[in-house]
Amino acid sequence: MSSIYLGVNIDHVATLRNARGTQYPDPVHAAEIAERAGADGITIHLREDRRHITDRDVRILRETLQTRMNLEMAVTDEMVEIALQTQPEYVCLVPEKREELTTEGGLDVLGQLERVKAATEKLTAAGIKVSLFIDADREQIDAAKACGAPFIELHTGHYSDAKSDVDQQNELKKIAAAAAYAHDLGITVNAGHGLTYHNVAAIAAIPEIYELNIGHAIIGRAVFDGLAKAVADMKAIMVAARR
């Protein structure tokens, strides 16, 4: 079976730093530890309100990462310009609302097709690989294809938040079907949001999924076990699910 890759989201290291307005813990240091522990890439979300990751973080991480940067951002002129200046390997376009604690759902590509397509084309022309964070919905996948996005990231929040085994299995089936559908269209499929050490294996076992982006669970585990072990343990579960 094909390999699966782990992108470690380090936003919540920045959240902890910003809670006191200090210079520590530094997400740049966290990225270096995560890479040494087996992370295949580092994911960061530069929000419009800069609530965790800052422009400084983006700049230094771009200079120091040994793996690849996946820059999550809203579909705005400001963010597109920052991406063009920064030149990350990947940009993931996500929905964003100031009042939300975290990204609450997938990007409505279908409802803003021309806007997303324009951003995708601009970033692609600069050599940046674009991913669209969407729900496991065929119409949204078709819209992503129409935008020319080579990657999508399937939103796993509904799966992660399911209150019963039946609901979770239903959400898992939706994700698996969406991954297969997108793969058949020639789109590379990533997934993420709300994944934990307890629920990640079933998602990692879906053969069409290329990479999982996971942050909160890893940073939470790192408080008790250390970041290197937290990353290595998550990667081990994912790899075992592919055997």
Curated annotation (Swiss-Prot):
- Could you tell me the Gene Ontology terms of the biological process aspect for this record? pyridoxine biosynthetic process
Gene3D superfamilies for the chain: Aldolase class I
Read off the InterPro entries from this record: Aldolase_TIM, PyrdxlP_synth_PdxJ, Pyridoxine-5'_phos_synth
Citing just one GO molecular function, the answer is:
pyridoxine 5'-phosphate synthase activity
The superkingdom of the source organism is Bacteria
Listed under subunit, the entry gives: Homooctamer; tetramer of dimers.
Tell me what reaction this enzyme catalyses.
Answer: 3-amino-2-oxopropyl phosphate + 1-deoxy-D-xylulose 5-phosphate = pyridoxine 5'-phosphate + phosphate + 2 H2O + H(+)
PANTHER family with a match to the protein in the record: PYRIDOXINE 5'-PHOSPHATE SYNTHASE
Annotated positions binding 1-deoxy-D-xylulose 5-phosphate? 11-12, 47, 52, 102
Protein's pathway: Cofactor biosynthesis; pyridoxine 5'-phosphate biosynthesis; pyridoxine 5'-phosphate from D-erythrose 4-phosphate: step 5/5
Native source species:
Vibrio cholerae serotype O1 (strain ATCC 39315 / El Tor Inaba N16961)
Q: Locate the coiled-coil region(s) and give their ranges.
A: none
Q: Where in the cell is it found?
A: Cytoplasm
Q: What is this protein called?
A: Pyridoxine 5'-phosphate synthase
| Keywords attached to this entry | Cytoplasm, Pyridoxine biosynthesis, Transferase
Pfam family, any one: PdxJ
- Active-site feature positions: 45, 72, 193
Taken from the UniProt entry, a GO cellular component term is: cytosol
Keyword RNA-binding in the entry? The reply is no
Please name the HAMAP family in this protein's record. Answer: PdxJ
Family according to the record: Belongs to the PNP synthase family.
Describe the task this protein carries out.
Catalyzes the complicated ring closure reaction between the two acyclic compounds 1-deoxy-D-xylulose-5-phosphate (DXP) and 3-amino-2-oxopropyl phosphate (1-amino-acetone-3-phosphate or AAP) to form pyridoxine 5'-phosphate (PNP) and inorganic phosphate.
